[in-house]
A protein has these predicted regions:
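An acidic-aromatic substrate-binding cleft motif
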Residues: 1
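Aromatic-lined carbohydrate-binding/catalytic grooves of carbohydrate-active enzymes
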Residues: 5-115, 129-135
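Substrate-binding and catalytic surfaces of secreted/luminal carbohydrate-active proteins
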Residues: 11-15, 121-129, 133-163
Length: 163
């Protein structure tokens, strides 16, 4: 994946009329990161070879096409591809995503120190039974990122991937 390929694909979504049919988000999955910048509060940084203009420029270009920009991270120490995950950096990462103009976050569940989820997991803590409540109280990592995203003031659609 690269900035060029992502933006070419986005343009095709518009040119082929898919945007008019309801396609809105262009989501960049794993392997976009170059790690964290310790001199900038440990914020995530994009791979400058793949994304030479940076993520804010990618978002600006997608928004100019009338599309939303989706990013990827993981609730663990690493992403599934072995890049820097958000565990312990939720507030930093949420603020970074918001500053880039991200509209959607796919949040995976790799390298989470054994904090496996289950098919009934919900970060909202809205429950209908006591047994379900017991299941969701063991998974604060999703709620931590949800809170961090909400505190940015930018509306970011939050999508959970529960491996």
């Amino acid at each position: 994946m690269s900035e060029t390929l992502l933006l070419q694909t986005a343009k095709l979504i518009v040119d082929y009329g898919l945007k008019d049919l309801g396609y809105h988000y262009v989501i960049l999955d794993d392997c976009w990161s170059a790690g964290r910048d310790a001199s900038a509060g440990n914020s995530l940084i994009a791979n400058s070879t793949k994304f030479p203009n940076g993520m804010a420029a990618v978002a600006d270009n997608l928004h100019a096409l009338g599309l939303g920009f989706g990013m990827y991270s993981s609730a663990g120490k690493y992403t599934c591809g072995g890049y820097a995950g958000s565990q312990g950096f939720e507030t930093v990462d949420a603020n970074t995503f918001a500053s880039w103009g991200v509209d959607y976050l796919k949040y995976d569940n790799c390298y989470n120190k054994g904090q496996a989820g289950n098919q009934l997991l919900s970060y909202t803590r809205r429950v209908s039974t006591a047994s379900f409540w017991e299941l969701v109280t063991n998974c604060p990592r999703y709620e931590t990122m949800a809170k961090a995203l909400n505190e940015t003031g930018r509306p970011i659609l939050y999508s959970l991937c529960n491996w």
